Amino acid sequence: MILKQGLKSTKENDEKVISKLKNMSDLTWAYIAGWIDGDGFISTLKTKHGHNARRIGIKLIDREIIEWFADLFHTSLTTATEDRREDGYNRKTQYITGVSGLRARYICEQIRPYLIEKTKDAEKFLRSFEDYPIKTVPYMQHTDKEFMAWFTGYSEAEGTFRISKTCKNKINSKGEHYKYMAPPEVKFELVNTNESIIRYCKTRLEKMGFFVQKVGVVKRNYSFMGKKGTKDRRVVKKKDLFRLFLAGSSAQPLYRSMLPFMRCERKISKVEKSLALVYRNKRRTKYGEKRTTVESSIVYMK
């Protein structure tokens, strides 16, 4: 269902939109590339009649992000066709916007230098235009600011911003059992099946001075996919997940660098609440590294 009508892709309309997009900064293009690498698509599929159906777009449950893209590119905002997950469960309502024609070619040209995961898709997309002279662009040569803009978009698409609250079972000096609610802890995770991207992000963040706790691996087994009781029901091997993790006071400097670029209200709210937690007591570990004590050091800013 169309919620907001955009400009039809004609040569005249595309040229008008492109003239406006030329005023956008490199950092905005890097941020957009992060979103496209995360939850976007760059498609060169053909129609059943053999015609090219080139499209660049994004599909999410966060309407404000899709609406921002739609307003920026003057495209239509629609709800995605209702479908079911492969495991048979219903999806949440998703919103989608896509761009085609000369407008899409220009957008692809602008985000291509900043893409990390979908570089081959972008090259294939541009090569599908017969008159397009493909140019070599530097790969993964972002400045620190460009990388942070890309990383912010990618993290809003693929990352998790949490404040963890843990209840622990403890015993006091009298031997009595009681429930102890530990102070909240900031936790950031970036999860993807592509190990090389996760490790690249870790290396780049550490070079910029951020402390990344670890990159973990979640081994995934076989599971059932498809609606129960149908012919589509099958057993598949899920890909392993790779997880970049920061917590506590280590996550907060990263949040401060990401916040100026962020546009997803749901995640902005979580980041602002996380930055309102103050870690103040320090201690030395047996390895000589300085860490923040979590359980006894969090106070709330008034």
Tell me what each language-model feature is.
Residues 1-302:
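Internal intein/HINT superfamily modules and their associated LAGLIDADG
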